[in-house]
């Protein structure tokens, strides 16, 4: 005998957890493995930053699409009576907000500062905008950290919903 849940929407919940796990894994991989590796291996920090920025932009778009899809699925599960997914929607909404701020506010602003500096023949870190760029980078890093922690919490909560503690 197994203690595996056999609820009506068990497969949908498993798919939800699977997609969420892959997504959060990609966030962690990009932010805490790929980006640091780029800066550690490429000698030109400007190039490393541009490549990392492009990768983070793709990750932000993936986050936006997956987050919206998961919110739709969570709404469907709530409408089918799985009320525990109400709280999951709030986590997803916060993650969506993090991705949107990064993708539509911070990254374009930083790209603009970088392009402006390059048009003047210098890397952004040697331009008059270096301080602002560093501040924006710090804010973007903080938001990405919040999104990553929310993602870890999301997967933790989802795994508890599918595999509740047995007494």
Give residue ranges: language-model regions.
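Hydrophobic residues within alpha-helical transmembrane segments
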Residues: 18, 61, 65-68, 94, ...
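Alpha-helical transmembrane segments and their helix-start/interface "positive-inside/aromatic belt" motifs
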Residues: 7-20, 86-96, 151-160
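Hydrophobic/aromatic residues in alpha-helical transmembrane segments
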Residues: 34, 106, 151-154
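Interfacial loop at the N-terminal end of multi-pass membrane proteins
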Residues: 2-68, 72-86, 112-130, 166
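Individual transmembrane alpha-helices with interfacial aromatic-anchor signatures
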Residues: 55-56, 127-148
């Amino acid at each position: 005998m197994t203690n595996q849940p056999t609820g009506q929407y068990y497969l949908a919940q498993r798919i939800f957890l699977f997609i969420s796990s892959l997504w959060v894994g990609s966030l962690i991989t990009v932010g805490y493995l790929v980006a640091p590796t780029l800066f550690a291996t490429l000698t030109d920090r400007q190039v490393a930053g541009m490549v990392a920025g492009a990768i983070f932009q793709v990750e932000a778009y993936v986050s936006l699409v997956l987050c919206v899809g998961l919110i739709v699925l969570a709404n469907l599960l709530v409408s089918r009576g799985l009320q525990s997914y109400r709280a999951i929607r709030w986590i997803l909404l916060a993650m969506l907000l993090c991705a949107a701020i990064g993708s539509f506010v911070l990254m374009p602003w930083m790209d603009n500062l970088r392009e402006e500096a390059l048009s003047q023949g210098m890397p952004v870190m040697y331009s008059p905008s270096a301080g602002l760029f560093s501040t924006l980078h710090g804010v973007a890093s903080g938001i990405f950290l919040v999104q990553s922690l929310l993602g870890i919490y999301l997967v933790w909560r989802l795994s508890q919903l599918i595999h509740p503690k047995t007494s």
